[in-house]
């Protein structure tokens, strides 16, 4: 079945180790230049003699052969064993012992290998293996098998197996290079970890003498007899060889960094070597135990060497199966710089920058602008930074009142309105049955009047233009008009049966609302003392009444939780001519006949039923036409905004306490609210965001009364704690003198109240 010569070669004894050494010498003498690797797809003949083995250049292996042919002082074979290669050789018993002794110069490494292989003879049959040899758990790898297969001439008894293994190994190399490129290591295939610790470029403190060949062989045939070999076997545990229960892999101290420094004093040589190599002995014995844990000892060697002579430096590229001999490209240089960014401060070559944790710098506005990468803004980064700069801080509002006045006998009644501030900067206050005036300019206090009926004052209201006439409502239903300069009562207006809770001026029209659920319009130019119109729309007493700034709409709030909006054009009705004057009031008859009430009755334009408590707080915005704000009582606690041009609700906010009063600032788009149960606070709101600007406290009881100064900066609040407090809440207005000029104009023109 077998050829006779072939069978003879198969049965011939194996060559002695000495022939292997001669092989190396012959190899070096016959190949002074760098050998050209054979094509990977060509199989070597199984009928070659011993001399033909010299042509086998061991393509695509990672063996460093460094020979000095002139003096033969040292033959240095750098055997950097890569754990990422597995050979399909079955071994029954393998014992390998490697001992490294801490010697400064020179360093001697003794390796004793005893191998008893057992092979299966397949004859002339060719049995293919799978592509990934390292993925086969039935095959184990050891250094002796690698040495026989790739370093020595082929043995006739093992030719078939070796040729098959070499071909598959070459195929694996080509396949991986096609997948990863020549610049990547095969460690990416063999390591099961998701984090790869590999060095693509040489990171050691040695010189790279790679002359564009696959075998890293640097033969310096010079007359200098000094050879300095720095063989760094840095495997760094980046190879994870699969093991199974039947075969254990022998780990022959591949993690030790050993620098062999041989110095021959034949020429003048200055070599400074500081080598600190701890003694490390690793015995890895395979006794077919079902133990897959390999003993691995890692020794870190720090070497500082200064050579001033010709140095032959042999450096393997850190376990790369295929050495990278091309000049690094720009991309590779950047990657190398990234991986070596920590080597300047640390002599340990095992520290790679790519595996270091870098603290992320805190992002600041000066570094970059945190904006969307899909932003379509045409502004530059500098412009965006400028626009995104912080706004001016909110103005500071003092939480301490600028002035506190005693107000004894002031009523603690939610339905009353007992303070008002005139355009002439005079504050009117109703205290029990009397009315007092406080001049804010001179701080003088004067008493205006005492109610003739002896009934308490229920409401006060200054005329808007002129500022010298004050309307006073009493609990007897009578409204009197006083000239404050002369301290004289000009007129008395009748029409209400009970107390008058609210008063509102609209030029020469005085509107009053009372406990009798009706609203009466009086034209003060008419001396007949008759009301011009009567508005009926509430089911309970009226406690809030305000005209819009343009004088076209009137808002009223009552204890029936209703907010009504009245149109002034609809309420104007021509008075009947020759109407007899009303009869004098008596205890048995009403001041207004039933016929007159039916003739002058109007209905509201809008009626809002969203509040759940009495509506006393009402305020029209001076900045937006038709914007109305209203506040509910204890069971509502909400501020609601309305569009009176469309009759729609805009928004609402829960304040958390009873809303007693509302007032807009004419200088800024803000409003102030006063509250009762349960917080008794004063809050300034920003509109339309309705974010609180500030909250003020000081009153010990419900803040039932509110008035704003004519300049719009100061507000006065009153409470049942018998005190009046003045607060600076709003900024000044550059056009604040405009209202004063109007007042001066109307004062000169005069308003004839008869």
Curated annotation (Swiss-Prot):
Claim: Manganese is one of the keywords in the record: no
SUPFAM superfamilies tied to this protein: WD40 repeat-like
Sequence ranges of Polar residues compositional bias: 326-339
Similarity comment: family membership: Belongs to the WD repeat CDC20/Fizzy family.
Places the protein is found: Nucleus
Subunit structure comment from the entry: The APC/C is composed of at least 13 subunits that stay tightly associated throughout the cell cycle: anapc1, anapc2, anapc3, anapc4, anapc5, anapc6, anapc7, anapc8, anapc10, anapc11, cdc20, cdc26 and cdh1.
Composition-biased stretches (Low complexity): 50-116, 202-325, 340-351, 587-598
GO biological process terms on file: anaphase-promoting complex-dependent catabolic process; cell division; positive regulation of anaphase-promoting complex-dependent catabolic process; protein ubiquitination
Pfam families: WD40_CDC20-Fz
Main function: Component of the anaphase promoting complex/cyclosome (APC/C), a cell cycle-regulated E3 ubiquitin-protein ligase complex that controls progression through mitosis and the G1 phase of the cell cycle.
Annotated Gene Ontology cellular component terms: anaphase-promoting complex
Pathway named in the protein's UniProt entry: Protein modification; protein ubiquitination
Organism per entry: Dictyostelium discoideum (Social amoeba)
Principal subcellular localization: nucleus
Residue spans of biased composition, Basic and acidic residues class: 1-10
Gene Ontology MF: a single term: ubiquitin ligase activator activity
Location of the region described as Disordered in the Swiss-Prot/TrEMBL record: 1-30, 47-116, 200-351, 570-598
Protein name as catalogued: Anaphase-promoting complex subunit cdh1
SMART domains recorded: WD40
UniProt repeat feature WD, residue ranges: 411-448, 452-492, 495-532, 537-576, 610-652, 654-695, 698-737
Underlying gene: cdh1
Entries under CDD domains matching the protein: WD40 (cd00200)
PROSITE patterns in the cross-refs: WD_REPEATS_1, WD_REPEATS_2, WD_REPEATS_REGION
Keywords for this protein: Cell cycle, Cell division, Mitosis, Nucleus, Repeat, Ubl conjugation pathway, WD repeat
InterPro entries in the record: Cdc20/Fizzy, WD40/YVTN_repeat-like_dom_sf, WD40_CDC20-Fz, WD40_repeat_CS, WD40_repeat_dom_sf, WD40_rpt
